[in-house]
Amino acid sequence: MLQKSDLINYFYSSFTSPEAKGIGTEHEKFIFHCANKKRIEFDGSVSIQNLFHFLIEKGWQKGEYNSFNQLISLSKNGASVTLEPGCKLELSGKILKNVHQTCTETYEHLRELQEYAELNNLCILGLGFDPISKREDVEFIPKDRYRIMREFMPKVGSRGLDMMTRTCTVQANFDYFDQEDLTKKFVLANRLQPIVMAIFCNSPFREGSHNSIKSNRIYTWQDTDTQRCGIKEEFLDHSFNIEKYVDFALEVKNYFLKINGKYVDTTSYSFYDLMSKTPKEESIR
């Protein structure tokens, strides 16, 4: 049976030497039809599926398929292209040595997307919140785990579905060397987060108009599953450590388990509950 110590040791096993340290970037974006300002569809003549086949011709490899045997990810040289709800496209970059390399990687990715966009009269938009679409106008991609999230989100906040369909971001990932280094980086990142949000806020538009909120993205995240989202007080203190993070994560409701290749709803269980006993698929339903 899985123990709390196993989870703590997982983080310890991820320590990296300073010489081998790396960074990674996750880059999300919206894609619109320029003519009608509608978001790109999942399938069709000009769609995510068609875009994926275009990228395969550029050297990307097929990745994961959904339960309908539709392609939902690509990979190449340690990087991947995946889908967020609402047909948002995400580059999950490979581990690189510095920001110059991740800049080159991101621009190469955007260059490939722009080539497809120009051929098909599409617009690529890098904003924190969709400035045009209403929530009900955005297509949910047929991805099994997103179905579970879609059903659960309204129970734990009023804006979770907006987060899923109408927000984008850029995320930075950093290696850590030991417990002290992890604490220093994690606490500093959380303390700096409000400043970073203010500096880079770029989403003052919502459903075609300016609504006086400088960052609709942050506004949306403030009421999205508050048990797991937001800046927690314990994340600001230098007494923070791996065990405290594990304690926090164990009490959060779990979204799903993958059992026999299928995503199964576990939203009524915390991670701690699932550690105590792994329920069978039929008992979860």
Name each region found by the language model.
Residues 1-157, 166, 285:
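Terminal catalytic/cofactor-binding subdomain
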Residues 129-285:
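Loop-rich catalytic cores of soluble enzymes, especially ATP-dependent carboxylate-amine ligases
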